[in-house]
């Protein structure tokens, strides 16, 4: 469902943001 898609997107977006803040 929509929540599954949202969770999948978040699981990609969150690490990307974390890399930007750590780099």
Curated annotation (Swiss-Prot):
It comes from the Eukaryota. Expressed by the skin dorsal glands. One of its GO terms (biological process) is defense response to bacterium. Keywords: Amidation, Amphibian defense peptide, Antibiotic, Antimicrobial, Secreted. Signal peptide: none annotated. The modification Alanine amide is found at residue 23. GO terms for cellular component: extracellular region. It is found in: Secreted. Shows antibacterial activity against S.aureus and S.uberis. This is Maculatin-1.2.
């Amino acid at each position: 469902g929509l929540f599954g898609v949202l969770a999948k997107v978040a699981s990609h977006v969150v690490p990307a943001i974390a890399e930007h803040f750590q780099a």
